[in-house]
Amino acid sequence: MSDTAVADTRRLNSKPQDLTDAYGPPSNFLEIDIFNPQTVGVGRARFTTYEVRMRTNLPIFKLKESCVRRRYSDFEWLKNELERDSKIVVPPLPGKALKRHPFRGDEGIFEESFIEERRQGLEQFINKIAGHPLAQNERCLHMFLQEEAIDRNYVAGKVLGEKDC
């Protein structure tokens, strides 16, 4: 084996890790949880909302922690906005109904098992989107995660980070 091959396989020098390094917060993180589903309303006006909790230290987000309540149609709005205005491939949302019930108007969407399955699917959806570097700059994502009410008449565009100002 040549000397250059041996030199290329040597380990890089690294500093020893202490407890602060090992158990401190990661350098950049974005955590989004969907939890606490609540079904509200009666009859045809009945729907389920979910709490969307975000924690981050990414400088692009104005709030480091937020918790908002969203319904399925809000996730549909976000998906449509991202498909219309961004350059990212948007993953699919979980299905709208568990199964067809020909004599039931709600199609099983208020059954606990369906609500939990949808919650998991929505959590996967939002984490895939939020994990994409280009999506993190989209104003619609920031509004979805951090503002109590979604302004559906907002002006689409990019969010300027601290370094962009």
Swiss-Prot record:
Xref: Pfam families: PX
Entry keywords, A to Z: Acetylation, Lipid-binding, Membrane, Phosphoprotein, Protein transport, Transport
Gene Ontology biological process: protein transport
Entry annotated with the keyword S-adenosyl-L-methionine: no
Residues with the N-acetylserine modification: 2
Modification type Phosphotyrosine: residues: 23
Residues with the Phosphoserine modification: 73
Region (Disordered): 1-20
One GO term describing the cellular component: membrane
Positions with a binding annotation for a 1,2-diacyl-sn-glycero-3-phospho-(1D-myo-inositol-3-phosphate): 71, 73, 96, 118
Domain PX: 28-151
Entry-linked SMART domains: PX
Cited function: May be involved in several stages of intracellular trafficking.
Family: Belongs to the sorting nexin family.
PANTHER family attached to this UniProt entry: RE52028P (PTHR45963), SORTING NEXIN-12 (PTHR45963:SF3)
Name of this protein: Sorting nexin-12
